[in-house]
Amino acid sequence: MVKVIEMFFRIFFFCSMLVFCSFPALAGEAEARVVLNMNTGWAFHRGEVESGGQPGLDDSGWIAAIIPHIMQLEKKHCGGDIIYDGVGWYRRTFRVPSQYKDKQIKISFEGVMNACEVYLNGQKISAHRGGYVGFVTDITTRINWDRDNLLAVRVSAEYDPLTPPGKPQAGMDFYYYS
C-alpha cells in the first residue's frame, strides 16, 4: 500500500511539474504572436504568366479571388465539363508596419493543391509539393517595411505522382481548394 501511495505522489509530482513548467512558454508564445488573415484581396489568373511573380505586372484584368479558391473547377462552373489541370497565379499586396521589424514574419499556407512556388517582391522565396500538407515560409528578411509588398503564388494543379489524387471529381461531395 505504501508503494502505491508513493508511486501516486511521484506521478502526481511529475505531471504537476510538467504542467507548471509549460505555462511560461505558452504564455510568452501567446503574447508574441500576431496573426493577420490574408484570405481576401487576391487577384487570380488561370494559365501560365511569364512574369507572374514580378511587381510591375498589370493584374487589373485578373479575377478577384478569396482564399481558399477552387482553381480546378472554374472552367466547369463557366459551362464546360472538364476539370482544369494546369497552372494558375495568385497575387496580393500587403504592408507590414516597421513596428514589427524586431519580430519574425512568416506566412502560413494551410495547403496548396498540388504544388506551388511562392514569390515576394519578385524573388522566389519557397516552393512546396503536396496539396494535403500545409507549410510556412519565413519572409522576415525580404519585407519592404511600411511599403507595398507583392506576394505571388504560382500554383500547379497538374498531375503529380507524389500527391494522391483522391477519388474522381464526379463522386465527391467536396472540392479540392488551390
Language-model-detected regions and their locations in the chain:
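Hydrophobic alpha-helical context, especially transmembrane and signal-peptide helices
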Residues: 13, 31-32, 77-79, 102, ...
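N-terminal secretory signal peptides that target proteins for export/translocation
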Residues: 1-9
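Accessory carbohydrate-binding/adhesion or oligomerization-edge regions at the termini
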Residues: 24-81, 150, 154-163, 167-169
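Short intrinsically disordered, low-complexity coil segments enriched in acidic
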Residues: 2, 20-23, 178
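Accessory beta-strand-rich segments of carbohydrate-active enzymes
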Residues: 36-38, 45-48, 85-178
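Bacterial N-terminal signal peptides
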Residues: 8-22
